[in-house]
């Protein structure tokens, strides 16, 4: 994920007005978007000029008031009052009390509550997706799709609520049963990043809930309105079912709240999505108290196109993986390795495809490419482009800031770098694609694996043997290993996460539910004898 200067803040809330030829008069800038007629739909989500950013059964907040901005024009949307440390303490206590009620509810009935949450999200999918587009900056279809991911994981969790459980194992002693018992860990803290302000919370929240846990969420400060809106939807479901709202608590805040969560022994599992740099600090703080952490950190993902690749698949896949969400996905393709025999043709096709990308306001349904999330991200983009040039790279497409309001940069292609160039080994959260030539399978598999991160990877080939070598022990060392599809766009049915400096955590489908539970091995003697294990006699 995107590197940040302040630990656990995930990214800082913007406070200054946009400078430049498109600056608006102060009187206009003082008008929040939520008060303008074209944004009246925000109030359908229960939002207003100033919103309370703490929920633990009731709404409140005694911390700093921040303003969130629209990345497409850098105009203020609305304000959110963040949590103070005292708010955090109160919320944790209420969440722990709520757990005593929630843990006693049978898992299938917990699944019914999660089903209702999914249905409530369905009802608000368009308006909530529009808020994601407005506050985060991703295009509308991606904003709606992100809410759909939360809906989908709710559906998945409902089914899982009737299936979670451990096996009965054969005992070596007659008259004995050996059972694996799974119980909820208790309180799950969830710290999410700006780039997926709905879906990542959903992956964690839905599964954690059916496992019998309560959740405490700290979203990114710059997407605080999304955190508030989602929590309002969930809170209504809980309140309608006469359940404690603190089952799904919210504490909007920055580094102080994130640090408190990481150090708090009452937080039994902390799920953190963010940069590798900050994730290391989180991991150390949690490990120092022997807690559990689920880390989903950086990705420096590669696509490999072999000489037998279907170029009608390679080009659109590389395009979507590199510029989707303006290069701000953790699964964004940042490195493209092309066999030397097809390198020039693929680069030329990519340049033509890049020239056809429709740029504009992200909530316009015809737009495919929106802004970066903050002005800081624009600066990081420019710094990376200059560093690539210094290291011998050639910008063959893009490389500049767009002359328009908002945080828009040109999607960029860089060729000519060495595979081991330091900038190519640095995750820059921006739409920059580094393109390399390779000669053979052995070297390119090694190049894929030589970066510190290990999230997502993909090859394009028709060679069945090569596919299985790619999937095997000497192939990709990533958590997501694809064939003939992009590096981005994971489905909820599979466990999501990566290896090495990506953190090793897994969210969403498969058996990721086990991370939200603790396992006990239970031996039950239902005989009248007392045989010891391994045939030991102790008389």
Curated annotation (Swiss-Prot):
Question: What Gene3D superfamilies does UniProt report for this protein, alphabetically?
Answer: Aldehyde Dehydrogenase, Chain A, domain 1 (3.40.605.10), Aldehyde Dehydrogenase, Chain A, domain 2 (3.40.309.10)
Active site, renumbered: 296 (proton acceptor), 330 (nucleophile)
Under the heading Pfam families, the entry gives: Aldedh
Molecular function GO labels: aldehyde dehydrogenase (NAD+) activity; betaine-aldehyde dehydrogenase (NAD+) activity; identical protein binding; L-aminoadipate-semialdehyde dehydrogenase activity
Report the record's disulfide bonds: none
Listed pathway(s): Amine and polyamine biosynthesis; betaine biosynthesis via choline pathway; betaine from betaine aldehyde: step 1/1
Instruction: Provide the transmembrane region boundaries.
Output: none
- Offer one example of a GO biological process linked to this entry: sensory perception of sound
Q: Which residues bind (S)-2-amino-6-oxohexanoate?
A: 331, 489-490
What reaction(s) does this enzyme catalyze?
Answer: nonanal + NAD(+) + H2O = nonanoate + NADH + 2 H(+); (S)-2-amino-6-oxohexanoate + NAD(+) + H2O = L-2-aminoadipate + NADH + 2 H(+); betaine aldehyde + NAD(+) + H2O = glycine betaine + NADH + 2 H(+); an aldehyde + NAD(+) + H2O = a carboxylate + NADH + 2 H(+)
Q: Nucleotide-binding: present as a keyword of the record? A: no
* Outcome recorded upon mutating residue 199 to V: In EPEO4; loss of alpha-AASA dehydrogenase activity
**Coiled-coil annotated spans:** none
**GO CC: one term?**
extracellular exosome
- Which residues are reported to carry the modification N6-acetyllysine? 94, 462, 500
Q: In which tissues is it expressed?
A: Abundant in hepatoma cells and fetal cochlea, ovary, eye, heart, adrenal gland, liver and kidney. Low levels present in adult peripheral blood leukocytes and fetal brain, thymus, spleen, skeletal muscle, lung and tongue.
Query: Does the UniProt entry include the keyword Transcription regulation?
Result: no
Transit peptide as recorded in UniProt = 1-26
As stated in the Swiss-Prot or TrEMBL entry, residues carrying the post-translational modification N6-succinyllysine are 94, 537
Q: Which family does it belong to?
A: Belongs to the aldehyde dehydrogenase family.
Provide the disease association from the record.
Epilepsy, early-onset, 4, vitamin B6-dependent: An autosomal recessive neurologic disorder ocharacterized by a combination of various seizure types. It usually occurs in the first hours of life and is unresponsive to standard anticonvulsants, responding only to immediate administration of pyridoxine hydrochloride.
What's this protein's function?
Multifunctional enzyme mediating important protective effects. Metabolizes betaine aldehyde to betaine, an important cellular osmolyte and methyl donor. Protects cells from oxidative stress by metabolizing a number of lipid peroxidation-derived aldehydes. Involved in lysine catabolism.
Q: Which PANTHER family match?
A: ALPHA-AMINOADIPIC SEMIALDEHYDE DEHYDROGENASE (PTHR43521:SF5)
Subunit text: Homotetramer.
The identity of this protein, by name, is Alpha-aminoadipic semialdehyde dehydrogenase
* Species per Swiss-Prot/TrEMBL record: Homo sapiens
Q: Which gene encodes it?
A: ALDH7A1
């Amino acid at each position: 994920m995107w590197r940040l200067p302040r630990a656990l803040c995930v990214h800082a809330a913007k406070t200054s007005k946009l400078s430049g030829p498109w600056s608006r008069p102060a009187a206009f800038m003082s008008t929040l978007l939520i008060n303008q007629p074209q944004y009246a739909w925000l109030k359908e989500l229960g939002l207003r000029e100033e919103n309370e950013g703490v929920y633990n059964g009731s709404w409140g907040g005694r911390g700093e008031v921040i303003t969130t901005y629209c990345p497409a024009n850098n105009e203020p949307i609305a304000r959110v009052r963040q949590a103070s440390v005292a708010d955090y303490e109160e919320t944790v206590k209420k969440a722990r009390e709520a757990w005593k009620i929630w843990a006693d509810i049978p898992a299938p009935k917990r699944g019914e509550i999660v089903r209702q949450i999914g249905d409530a999200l369905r009802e608000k999918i368009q308006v909530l997706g529009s808020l994601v587009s407005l506050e985060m900056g991703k295009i509308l279809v991606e904003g709606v799709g992100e809410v759909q991911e939360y809906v989908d994981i709710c559906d998945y969790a409902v089914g899982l609520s009737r299936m979670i459980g451990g096996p009965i194992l054969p005992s070596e002693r007659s008259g004995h049963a050996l059972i694996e018992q799974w119980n909820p860990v208790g309180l799950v803290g969830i710290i999410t990043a700006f780039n997926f302000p709905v879906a990542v919370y959903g992956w964690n929240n839905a599964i954690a809930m059916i496992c019998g846990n309560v959740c405490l969420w700290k979203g990114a400060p710059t997407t605080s309105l999304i955190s508030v809106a989602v929590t309002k939807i969930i809170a209504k479901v809980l309140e309608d079912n006469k359940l404690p709202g603190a089952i799904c608590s919210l504490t909007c805040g920055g580094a102080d709240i994130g640090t408190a969560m990481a150090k708090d022994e009452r937080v039994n599992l902390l799920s953190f999505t963010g940069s590798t740099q900050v994730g290391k600090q989180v991991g150390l703080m949690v490990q120092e108290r022997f807690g559990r952490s689920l880390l989903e950190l950086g990705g420096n993902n590669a696509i490999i196109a072999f000489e037998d690749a279907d170029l009608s698949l390679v080009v659109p896949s590389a395009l979507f993986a590199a510029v989707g969400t303006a290069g701000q996905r953790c699964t964004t393709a940042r490195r493209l390795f092309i066999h030397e025999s097809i390198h020039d043709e693929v680069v030329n096709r990519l340049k033509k495809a890049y020239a056809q990308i429709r740029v504009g306001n992200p909530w316009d349904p015809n737009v495919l490419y929106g802004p970066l999330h903050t002005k800081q991200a624009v600066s990081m983009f420019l710094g990376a482009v200059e560093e690539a040039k210094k290291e011998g790279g050639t910008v063959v497409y893009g490389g500049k800031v767009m002359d328009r309001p908002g945080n828009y940069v040109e999607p960029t292609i860089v060729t000519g770098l060495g595979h081991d160039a330091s900038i190519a080994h640095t995750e820059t959260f921006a739409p920059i694609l580094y393109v390399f030539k390779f000669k053979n399978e052995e070297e390119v598999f090694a190049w894929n694996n030589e970066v510190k991160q290990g999230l997502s990877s993909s090859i394009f080939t028709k060679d069945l043997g090569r596919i299985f070598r790619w999937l095997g022990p000497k192939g990709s060392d990533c958590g997501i290993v694809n064939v003939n599809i992009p590096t981005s766009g994971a489905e909820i049915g599979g466990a999501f996460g990566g290896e090495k400096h990506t953190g090793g955590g897994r969210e969403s489908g498969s058996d990721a539910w086990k991370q939200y539970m603790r396992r006990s091995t239970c031996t039950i003697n239902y005989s009248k004898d007392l045989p010891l294990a391994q045939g030991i006699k102790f008389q």
